[in-house]
Amino acid sequence: MRTTIYVDGFNLYYGCLKNTDFKWLNLQVLFSHILARHHSINRICYFTAVLRKSEHDPRAHLRQKAYLNALQTLPNLEIHYGKFLRHQVRMPNANPPPKIVEVFKMEEKGSDVNLSVHLLNDAWKDRYDCAVLVTNDSDMAEAMRLVKKGFNNKKLALITPRGRPTAGLKRYADFAKTIDDADLAVAQFPYRIKRPVASDIYKPQSW
């Protein structure tokens, strides 16, 4: 069964990777481990946005760059980029006075829209028999509904980063699975990834 996997990168990170030792994650190995053998993974579509250098964590963007380079060594993986928007908002201060302060807030934009568009477009172009969504974001429910309504020969699956899947997503899934630590542990890249032309990639030290 031709299976395409759509990964909400930030939902995956905050759902089951942050504050763990499993961030150096090989997605091809992970999903081959989780899915049954009749699934032939033809593409993995990874949706993310490039981090900017920040005072809070000045090396975060370098760790992300190393990981994206590692992902690009996987032959059937595509990376689709959204972007971060920086805007000024008024929010309550944790230690007043004053009670309200102006802060700069970074928000990732585009990943959920990009994922939905690719999911529908790939169904229309008959690029998969089964689409697997790796997310627990309820915003994906409408795209899943449209696929089920318009392409009744297509299967939809849901892999959630820990916890119970959102009811609004699960109702459109033919099956659902949850990622646990055992899945993550067996799907780590090696510390050093050799490349035939470019320089080798190393797991970030702080990971």
Description of each model-found segment:
Residues 80-207:
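Nuclease catalytic cores that cleave nucleic-acid phosphodiester bonds
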Residues 1-104, 155-157:
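Domain-level signal for Mg2+-assisted phosphodiester chemistry and nucleotide/NA-binding surfaces
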